[in-house]
A protein has these predicted regions:
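Anion-binding (especially nucleotide phosphate/pyrophosphate-binding) glycine-rich loop
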Residues: 1-155, 159-162, 172
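Phosphate/pyrophosphate- and phosphate-bearing ligand-binding catalytic cores of soluble enzymes
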Residues: 5-7, 11-18, 55, 166-227, ...
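Short hydrophobic-aromatic micro-motifs
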Residues: 26, 56, 65-66, 100-102, ...
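Residue-level signal for inorganic ion chemistry
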Residues: 30, 52, 131, 163, ...
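A cross-taxon signal for low-complexity, glycine/charged-rich
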Residues: 80, 90-101, 219-254
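Beta-rich strand-turn-strand
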Residues: 120, 362-368
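Structural preference for long, well-ordered alpha-helical segments within the folded cores
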Residues: 368-371, 375
Length: 391
């Protein structure tokens, strides 16, 4: 069934809580509904949203907003399946992956919760990321050393131009850091994700190399503490990265997907604002990737300013470049906790810009964004780029 509303209030459909309306809003329940939508006749522009967690509406939307309610989670029955090509991680020696088909309208954290309860590995580190499954495959969401591309097998879509259903393999999705083929300007908006097939595992595969995540998880299973501040000893507790430590130790059977999920949820709740209480889009900026020489200059300046023993948080990439957390740069520029009108930099996580008063204007958020970008550029010679889409 397709439900159409005009001049729909979108305040509760974007996590920033921007008080905007859409000229036309269409919500559909099934894959078959997409065939019945006359895309050529829709008011332009056309925007498909998920949970509205990565958007900043700058004004009322003068076109059509689409939203999926395709809601199912299903383990695919593939008896005798020997296809280990669904993900590079799997080989002939490793167990056959568990393929799970999930509707685009499923809340992503509901999928993570389901997987953990089923004892399936792969999605636990992505727990509590806001948004829906369809948008996760477009954005390539990630957290705590894992990106959604690490568990995607195939993405199924409706091609609004050719009016046909198509699928994209992992390789065809062209995933990069918070990027995919679906975000390329030449095809952005053409494909509507209907469902995603994930490749999970029944074999224990904990990814605990991020910051002090391993410490927090092991403390939890040992009954020492569930305190998320265990992870805060690392300056990149959320929104950054650390040099991963190899998981060479034997797997502790007490560590399950549910345990890791519980710890990560505690950490995220401690570090990030609850959208229902204080609007935000989560991480506002992407972490910049710079040359090794540029990083050395930043590190030298930091040691001169903060002491010779100071270590700039970073992650060395395979191609020789270095990823430095935007959160660290923003905090070093003095923005943590600063307000500008109704907008503010979150006092517990400088990577997050919040709708502090609940009625911030888009211009206030954009103004704060621009000032942060300018100050980071002036201090570090690095240009930050927003992760949030400006609509």
């Amino acid at each position: 069934m397709i439900k159409t509303e005009y001049y729909k209030d979108l305040t509760k459909m974007n996590t920033f809580g921007m008080k905007v309306k859409a000229r036309c809003f269409m919500e559909y329940d099934s894959v078959a509904d997409l065939v019945d939508i006359e895309f050529e006749d829709l008011a332009r522009p056309v925007l498909h949203i998920g949970g509205g967690s990565n958007l900043l509406f700058t004004d009322d939307f003068k076109g059509t907003v689409l939203h999926s309610r395709i809601n199912f989670i299903e383990i695919l029955d593939v008896p005798g399946n020997t296809d280990t090509s669904c993900h590079p991680e799997h080989s002939e020696e490793s167990p056959t992956p568990v393929l799970v088909s999930v509707g685009a309208g499923v809340i992503f954290d509901d999928f993570c919760d389901w997987a953990a309860k089923e004892g399936l590995w792969g999605a636990e580190n992505l727990s509590y990321i806001p948004g829906e499954v369809g948008a996760s495959a477009i954005q390539n969401i990630g957290a705590y050393g894992v990106e959604v591309k690490d568990i995607i097998h195939k993405v199924y879509c409706y091609d609004t131009v050719e009016e046909e259903f198509v699928s994209f393999s992992l390789e065809e999705c062209g995933y990069g850091y918070r990027d995919s083929i679906f975000k390329k300007p030449e095809i952005k908006g053409r494909y509507i994700v209907t469902h995603v097939v994930f490749a999970l595992s029944r074999e224990a595969k904990p990814q605990l190399g991020y910051g002090h995540l391993r410490d927090a998880v092991m403390a939890s299973v040992a009954g020492v503490s569930d305190d998320p501040r265990l992870l805060q000893r690392h300056p990149l507790a959320e929104g950054g990265m650390s040099q991963e430590t190899p998981a060479t130790e034997a797997h502790d059977p007490r560590v399950t997907p549910a345990v890791i999920r519980r710890v990560i949820i505690k950490i995220r709740k401690e570090k990030l604002p609850e959208p229902s209480v204080m609007g935000s889009a989560g991480s506002f900026f992407m972490n910049p990737v710079i040359s090794a020489d540029h990083y050395q200059k930043i590190e030298a300046a930091a040691k001169a300013e903060l002491g010779v023993d100071y270590k700039v948080p970073h992650y060395d990439l395979p191609d020789g470049t270095v990823k430095v957390p935007a959160a660290w740069m923003i905090e070093q520029c003095g923005w943590k906790g600063k307000r500008s009108g109704g907008a503010a930099v979150y006092d517990k996580q400088p990577l997050v810009i919040v709708n502090y008063t609940g009625d911030a204007y888009p211009e206030e958020i954009i103004g704060l964004e621009r000032r942060i970008i300018a100050s980071v550029k002036a201090k570090f010679g690095v240009e930050l780029h927003p992760e949030v889409d400006h609509i």
